[in-house]
Amino acid sequence: MSNADTATINLADFLRAQRRERYPIAVVHGLPFAGKSIFARQLAQRNSFGYLDVLTEVSNRPELIDTIDRFDVAALRSLILSYATAAGTDVLLIDELDFLVPVWAGDLVSFQEMVRRLRHPEKQITFGFFLQTRPSLEQWRLMNAAHVSCVLPFESIRSL
């Protein structure tokens, strides 16, 4: 299956199937205001997936907001894993990460490395990231065992 076939992907099924993969993730990217957040929340609700809005979570926690200029990939990993534990779900959708990109100086290499290494210590969880499109994401080659890209353009996802 090639990237040209991504137009037929049902994201809920894709995320569930990713549980068996070496990298149990999907990165969905699209233009600003394309409806990614609404889609992610609805997908989570309809499928009993966890949903983490990182911007809201950081904004609502004084101990995190005070470190926003130093909020690095390790801090994000810690936040995601603690939220995944609390959510008690097999799939966690992670949204509104884009506010952190300026903190990371526009370099998503450390983010990509974190995604590759993101594992819950106690259970198999698939992580779905929703991000704004940027060149480093469009060029990222992260494939699953079936040679299907785990980096998916939002416009190629089948609607709910």
Residues covered by each model-derived region:
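Mid-core helix/loop region of P-loop NTP-binding domains shared across ATPases and GTPases
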Residues: D72-V91, E113-F130
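Conserved P-loop NTPase "ATPase switch" module shared by AAA+ and STAND
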Residues: T85-D107
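Short loop/turn segments at strand-loop or loop-helix junctions that form parts
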Residues: V54-V58, D90-D98, L131-T133
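P-loop NTPase Walker A phosphate-binding motif
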Residues: K36-F49
